[in-house]
Amino acid sequence: KSGALALYRDDILEADIKKYGCLNGNFAVIANIPYYITGAILKLFLEGEPRPSRMVLLAQKEVAERIVAKDNKESLLSISVKAFGEPKLVQKVPRGAFNPPPTVDSAILAIENISDGKFVKKGLEIRRFFEILKAGFAHKRKYAKRNLETVLGVERLNEIWRNFDLDEK
């Protein structure tokens, strides 16, 4: 530990972040992570407490691209991350930059302005949000409305669709 910078070596999935004095928004996570636990790390820091104000990760390029996807390319992963912060692909890192080179390309992924503010402002429970989101992506070939019926119920869903003038597709 030196002034404002503190480095910790720990198992990121097992560590008690609070023991390091980290509070919501007063720390950043900057890491070269094992690619196979990217989802678990994002879930831990975005959905859990305390939350960092930002994350900068070296991740598998394809995963980073899925996270920053827009329009019709959105996924459960990209919406999950965007619900808490603003992801940005900073730079692609070719496999040749490493020795020995891995079998995949990498990318630097930054997630800024991390908070649960969107949930608090709208009075949403994080757990319920993800329940609905997962139902929406449950069956790719089905219409979103059909996927959501099991979670929200037909009557409530019809009301939402009418109120927002949504296309059933």
List each model region and its residues.
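C-terminal lobe and adjacent flexible extensions of AdoMet/dcAdoMet transferase-like proteins
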Residues: 113, 133-169
